């Protein structure tokens, strides 16, 4: 719920929900889950442009992650260093630190096979971090995400693609960027 609260623009609720979940995760002895809860709190702080609180939550997430072991429930298998990198990239992107966002988004692509939608998210995250500095590369990476998405009916995936499209708007004069933006428009308007 905390992640969803950030996604719908309610970072204060995201922070409150993440803090409550941290208590439950600690009580259950699930360090990986606790780390994830700190990450979601960090993202809430980033959405509020509170870099100091975001950094504190990122550090808490790292500490909790270092205590995690492999004996967690199967439903936590998705939570690995690639996932942690993706969440960190989100934070830095939302804080406007695009170089660090790109660094962590690149690391997030070292993810477990089989999570196609997650890979598309991470590619979009990298493309959005690169949009200002290297629009050609952002369009290329965004196109890679489009290829993965194919016929996926995912509102969130389309939101990620629209975000990249929006961030590339200043570079519409570049043919590859314009082509990517048109593809995103076609795919997301047809599906939504």
Where in this protein do the model-derived segments appear?
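Conserved binding/catalytic microenvironments
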Residues: 1-192
């Amino acid at each position: 719920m905390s992640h969803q609260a950030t996604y719908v623009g309610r970072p204060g609720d995201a922070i409150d929900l993440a803090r409550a979940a941290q208590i439950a995760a600690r009580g259950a002895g699930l360090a990986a889950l606790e780390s994830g809860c700190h990450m979601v709190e960090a993202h809430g702080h980033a959405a509020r442009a509170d870099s100091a609180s975001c950094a504190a939550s990122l550090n808490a997430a790292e500490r909790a992650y270092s205590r995690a072991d492999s004996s967690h429930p199967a439903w936590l298998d998705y939570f690995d260093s690639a996932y942690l990198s993706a969440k960190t990239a989100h934070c830095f992107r939302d804080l406007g630190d695009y170089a660090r966002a790109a660094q962590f988004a690149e690391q997030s692509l070292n993810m477990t096979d089989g999570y196609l939608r997650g890979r598309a998210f991470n590619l979009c995250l990298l493309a959005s971090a690169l949009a200002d500095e290297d629009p050609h590369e952002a369009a290329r990476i965004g196109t890679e995400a489009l290829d993965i998405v194919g016929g996926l009916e995912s509102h969130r995936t389309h939101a990620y693609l629209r975000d990249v499209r929006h961030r590339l708007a200043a570079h519409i004069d570049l043919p590859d960027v314009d082509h990517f933006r048109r593809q995103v428009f076609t795919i997301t308007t047809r599906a939504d």
